[in-house]
UniProtKB/Swiss-Prot annotation:
Membrane topology annotation: Multi-pass membrane protein
Record GO terms (molecular function): dolichyl pyrophosphate Glc1Man9GlcNAc2 alpha-1,3-glucosyltransferase activity; endonuclease activity
Entry-linked Pfam families: Alg6_Alg8, Endonuclease_5
Enzyme superclass (EC): transferase
Residues that span the membrane, as ranges: 6-26, 60-80, 96-116, 156-176, 190-210, 228-248, 324-344, 350-370, 395-415, 423-443, 452-472, 482-502
Protein name: Dolichyl pyrophosphate Glc1Man9GlcNAc2 alpha-1,3-glucosyltransferase
Keywords: Endoplasmic reticulum, Glycosyltransferase, Membrane, Transferase, Transmembrane, Transmembrane helix
Its job: Dolichyl pyrophosphate Glc1Man9GlcNAc2 alpha-1,3-glucosyltransferase that operates in the biosynthetic pathway of dolichol-linked oligosaccharides, the glycan precursors employed in protein asparagine (N)-glycosylation. The assembly of dolichol-linked oligosaccharides begins on the cytosolic side of the endoplasmic reticulum membrane and finishes in its lumen. The sequential addition of sugars to dolichol pyrophosphate produces dolichol-linked oligosaccharides containing fourteen sugars, including two GlcNAcs, nine mannoses and three glucoses.
Gene name for this UniProt entry: algn-8
Coiled coil ranges: none
Cellular component aspect of the GO annotation: endoplasmic reticulum membrane
Subcellular location: Endoplasmic reticulum membrane
Pathway(s) of this molecule: Protein modification; protein glycosylation
Similarity annotation: Belongs to the ALG6/ALG8 glucosyltransferase family.
């Protein structure tokens, strides 16, 4: 299906579905926006931010007020004047419902169009995706953004205009990806003047522009002054257009009226239903302390009021009260730390969407009076970033599941209860299908067991809240199940933030240190023969051998194909070659290749054996070294120990600098003499097969095995569960060509073929 056909099909499906949702439940936000239309239509501009006939007063920035005035003009033009009556009590009719629902649907069409523009025209979206999967990445981005479950719940049922605002943010992302930084800044400034909650992204923009827009080499002042002036103009134009009419109408008082409505301080630390952030955990800790201390009769504390389910100011019973300024300080400090780390660690390579994710996360997690719907501000840039970097797919899936559970309490009527489950479950499977198309990775990589366990736990709490709580407790403890959902989702979101930070910064100094330390511990256990293994002590024990190898995509070396090729022994008949894709999570560390690949290889081998037990090999051959290693434990040792199968390391090359590291620089001259000796032996004895022991150091852990009449050799070292003599004898029977051991060669060729066909296209592999 072509791009245009996909966009039209998805648009038709989504708009048709949203039309079916017109009769669905609406929240108080429905009356909020109707009243705003009425206020902007019926009152002069100077009274927009003072009109208080209804409790649902205008509290969005002026651009949104102008948008409401535009909707009011359309309503008046088409005869929907009942929408434009200022009333103290809510007004609702079928005509009002139809008009306001369709106003959202038309905004959704704009949003879908912007999703298509960004997904199919952004030059940076698929730069780290293998060439043959790039179109899949673009299609996944479009479908996942256009059908975002949080937007359907919040806009098409609950009722808001988040899709229109998200479209403006995506336009800013698009301009950044195309390096039109002034247009991106202008778009963001427009967005802020529509809804000030998008200040969540502000620090992300600041840090990204400092790194990518401004110049800090050469004559800094001369180079940056015109850039700063241009940026300031781009940012100020929307603000001037937004507030100048109010200054003209009411002077400074007009600005004060806007500020009073936009930044109320009488709403309490958390919303009526706690958003899944740090303050939900803080409230819960305070409640637990109050209950325990009251039970033990230690001190006298006021009963907590934050479990009333009302929007109000409140005090904590035991823990210190938290002021708006205190939360702002936490937001700024946490943002500064993580964004500074992103600049230092990633320098100019970090994508803006990641800056936006971290900036929004800090505001959402520590912000004052955060609404659960604000999770949209995290999921949108996270969706974009996960497409750009497939390493984050599992984090994205977990985030959207947490978002779904946190949004469920918004819809509580019987029909909408089933509807919200259907929407979120459908989106979950859509996400799995399209993300799998981007990487071809197995589902186990996308949905780790720990995530599944947390979803089941949250699911049980949700079922209890919806179907059992009222039946068991009637009208008692109404807030308890909502609090349980808030706490569980807050805990999961905290863990997700930790995982995101680890995935982003963990490949730095700390993760390298940690990876080396754990590798060295494992190697100590390997040298002590702690791991159980089906050892090979005689050639009669060997009936089936297997070679294993990996090949990586050119544009993303973390995406690999693993192939394992099975052969009978000693007659060397091919039995099967099985391959699959994997994502390598850890970075490459010199002399620690096993850290990156060994566990992935061993897990894949065990999964193959589990599915096909008849293919369990007696020996596994790895492309690399075994005991011939600077620490005595190369790749083959790790794979053998982790899989429980005797292993042999077979390397095609013996690079001298690695050899020096392995046996010590003091033996450098001996190595050079030995290499020259081997060349002379092979040159003068072309028809003599056999091997030459690498006996510079004792005990001998490496044999150089000649490949037929070739002057080349392969380098054999024992891995785990087998000795060098037997390893060399087995390998000598596996040479069918003059390149390497046949099972390894077959695995290598197959993995390269699959990379070429499914990742890189027909370009020549390096």
């Amino acid at each position: 299906m072509g791009e245009v056909q996909l966009v039209l099909a998805v648009t038709a499906i989504l708009i048709s579905f949203k039309c079916l949702l017109i009769p669905a439940y609406v929240s108080t936000d429905f009356e909020v926006h109707r009243n705003w239309m009425a206020v902007t239509w019926q009152r002069p501009l100077c009274e927009w931010y003072t009109e208080a006939t209804s409790e649902w007063t205008l509290d969005y920035p002026p651009f949104f007020a102008y948008f409401e005035l535009g909707l009011a003009s359309v309503a008046h033009f088409f005869g929907f004047d009942e929408c434009l009556v200022i009333s103290k009590t809510p007004r609702f009719s079928r005509r009002i419902l139809i008009f306001q629902r369709f106003s959202v649907i038309f905004c959704d069409i704009l949003y879908i169009a912007v999703c298509a523009l960004y997904s199919f025209r952004s030059p940076r979206l698929v730069s780290r995706i293998p060439k043959k999967l790039q179109q899949n990445g673009r299609e996944a981005c479009f479908v996942l953004l256009a059908s975002l479950q949080a937007l359907i719940i919040c806009d098409s049922i609950h009722f808001q205009y988040n899709s229109m605002l998200t479209a403006i943010f995506l336009m800013s992302l698009f301009f950044i990806d195309t390096e039109r930084y002034l247009m991106a800044a202008l778009s963001y400034s427009i967005l802020l003047n529509f809804k000030h909650i998008y200040v969540y992204y502000a620090l992300g923009y600041v840090f990204y522009y400092l790194v990518n827009y401004f110049q800090f080499s050469g004559n800094v002042l001369l180079a940056n002054t015109p850039k700063a002036i241009s940026l300031a103009i781009a940012l100020l134009i929307p603000f001037c257009a937004s507030i100048f009419p109010f200054i003209h109408a009411s002077g400074v008082q007009g600005l004060q009226n806007i500020a009073t409505r936009l930044f109320p301080v009488s709403r309490g630390l958390t919303h009526a239903y706690w958003a899944p952030n740090f303050w939900a955990l803080y409230n819960f800790a305070d409640l637990c302390l109050y209950r325990v201390l009251s039970l033990l009769k230690i001190g006298k504390f006021d009963a907590p009021t934050y479990t009333s389910g009302l929007v109000q100011e409140y005090s904590h019973s035991v823990l210190p009260n938290v002021s708006p300024m205190g939360t702002l300080c936490l937001v700024v400090i946490s943002s500064m730390i993580v964004l500074t780390g992103l600049v230092i660690r990633r320098k100019d390579s970090a994508d803006f969407s990641l800056f936006a994710v971290f900036s929004a996360f800090c505001f959402f997690y520590f912000g004052y009076h955060v609404h659960e719907k604000a999770i949209i501000l995290v999921t949108v840039p996270m969706t974009v970033f996960a497409i750009k970097n497939p390493k984050y797919h599992s984090i994205l899936i977990h985030l959207t599941c947490i978002a779904s559970f946190s949004l469920f309490p918004l819809l509580f009527t019987p029909f909408e209860t089933l509807l919200k489950y259907a929407i979120c479950v459908s989106y979950f499977f859509i996400q799995l299908v399209f993300l799998k198309r981007v990487t071809l990775m197995p589902l186990s990589d996308l949905i780790p067991t720990r995530h599944v366990a947390s979803w089941l736990l949250m699911g049980m709490v949700e079922v209890y809240n919806t179907f059992l709580h009222k039946w068991l407790w009637t009208s008692r403890l109404p807030f308890a199940p909502l609090m349980a959902i808030s706490i569980l989702t807050a805990i999961e979101l905290t863990g997700l933030i930790g995982a995101l930070i680890w995935s982003t910064f963990g490949d730095g100094i700390f993760e390298i240190w940690w990876a080396k330390a754990t590798c060295q511990i494992r190697e100590r256990l390997i040298r002590d023969s702690t791991y159980s293994v089906q050892a090979v002590e005689d050639l009669d024990d060997v009936k089936l051998v297997a070679g294993i190898d990996t090949s990586a995509a050119k544009l993303n070396s973390d995406m690999v194909y693993i192939s394992v090729s099975f052969w009978t022994y000693p007659d060397l008949k091919h039995v099967a070659t099985i391959s699959d894709t994997r994502m390598l999570e850890l970075p490459y560390i010199p002399q620690y290749l096993a850290v990156r690949e060994a566990e992935v290889m061993a897990d894949f081998l065990k999964s193959v054996i589990t599915e096909r037990p008849e293919l369990r090999p007696d020996v596994i051959l790895c492309d690399g070294f075994g005991e011939f290693h600077s620490r005595g434990c190369g790749m083959a040792c790790h794979v053998g120990a982790l899989s429980g199968i005797a292993s042999i390391g077979v390397a095609k090359n013996l690079t001298l600098h690695h050899t020096y590291e392995t046996i010590g620089m003091e033996n450098k001259s001996k190595v050079d003499s030995f290499v020259e000796h081997c060349r002379e032996v092979y040159k003068n004895n072309k028809t003599s097969p056999g091997f030459i022991p690498f006996d510079i150091v004792e005990p001998v852990v490496l044999n150089i095995l000649r490949m037929g009449s070739s002057m080349n050799g392969v380098f054999v070292s024992a891995g785990y569960g087998i000795d060098l003599e037997l390893s060399t004898e087995i390998c000598s029977q596996l040479l069918l060509n003059n390149t390497t051991i046949e099972p390894i060669r077959a695995a290598d060729l197959e993995s390269r073929r699959l990379v070429r066909e499914n990742f890189d296209g027909n370009e020549k592999l390096e």
